[in-house]
């Protein structure tokens, strides 16, 4: 399915047109030489091929595009909003007040700040899933509930990456820049427009570092192919691993919130 990009579909249509034009010339030549129409068709096309595309028989490019583009945009927004939500506390000099309200617990502070956003982002994920599979009737052979679970995992993994970026760089501007870069690269390297197996081996190894890649694999295995969730366990585990990233920067985050001073 990842090969069925717009260029491939256009090439297929143009090739079909050229073959039909060539066949029309050959048919006219055979008819002029006295062959019957049946004899001409049997000579031009002795074997008739009847092909049916699996899981997307309409070859609707939107089916391949929107099911990853929508969550990709949501993921990018989550990166930016999460990093900004934490960084703005330092920028506005309210980080110490937040930590005081959380009894100097960075975990409590992060949960209090980000949990409402998690709920809102998950509602957005539910909305686009219902819109794609319930309203537009895009193929969803596994049922909508596994895709809702995949959406929740993507939301949590994206928030974890946003926290990690701010904890890693320690400044709002660098965290937002890194989040923007990582989010934009996700669209190219996730595999829904260009197959990962055709990429350079280095990029094939790096693609696992992007949450959108694992969400795309979940979509392909669950919604398109209709496999049970157990057969996509590796993608689920990968998204769960992304959720562990904040634990590597918790100590640094606490130091930032308590002691860092924002420099314009």
Features from the language model and the residues they span:
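Juxtamembrane loop-helix boundary motifs flanking transmembrane segments in multi-pass membrane proteins
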Residues: 41, 50, 54-58, 98-111, ...
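Low-complexity, flexible helical/coil segments
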Residues: 18-25, 29-37, 84-91, 109, ...
